[in-house]
Amino acid sequence: MTREELKHRVDEAIERHADEIVAVGEAIRRHPELGFKELRTSALVETKFRQLGLAPRTGLAITGVRADAVGGAGPGPTFALVGELDALVVAGHPEADRSTGAVHACGHNAQIAGLVGAAIGLVRARAMDRLAGRVVFIAVPAEEGGDLEWRLNEVRAGRLEFLGGKCELLRLGHLDDVDLAMMIHTTPRPEDGLACVPGSNNGRFGKTARFVGRAAHAGGAPHMGVNALYAAHLALAAINALRETFRDEDTIRVHPILT
């Protein structure tokens, strides 16, 4: 069987299960969950992997799921397909969860549907029998940067070290055997179609600063006070002054959150 014939068999298997794959994405869209709290979503992914005869490992970096499909053509590289479990916080969105503000406005529901769809295609078409190495399907938690105060509390309690799910998976060794990883992402750019394969991905870290003021009578004794808001404004202005030094090709992004 040629490579193109094998790809065609996988495509046909995906088409046969298209309704099931779409249903996965829709189920996740209806029940958005925030990072490291994607219990329902990860349980759905686990169920789908088990239905394919895979043996997923769960609870990785709290809610991550990994299932390995071993090729029948001998040893080879380990290739990871990645999907992200979590939703954004957009409280004003019409589909936002009323209690958490979570909504899949970044399309991670479609990502996970694609991850499950790829697993369905490779397994149902018996493509792994003809491939060497392994294909690893990984559903990762907490790609988005919201809910930071909760995550920082988890760090202080020793349950997390990093604020993002991929960083935690790396720290815990769950990606040590992976030679190559890729993912798709929905895109707002018409020239990319409905989804794209990113050429690169930014790393991310978070910093927290606390500005402490001192209360004073605004009319009678303003000189006795310290305005914490002014201090925060100065800090943001200093950060903004750095932006012109960022090189476009480095795709540096700075997103302050003031609470």
Language-model regions, residue ranges each:
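N-proximal short alpha-helices
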Residues: 1, 14-18, 22, 198-208
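Intrinsic structural disorder
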Residues: 1, 6, 27-28, 179, ...
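Acidic/His- and Gly-rich active-site-bordering loop/insert found
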Residues: 3-105, 109-136, 141-142
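Histidine/acidic-residue-rich, glycine-tolerant segments that coordinate divalent metal ions
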Residues: 90-103, 109-110, 122, 129-257
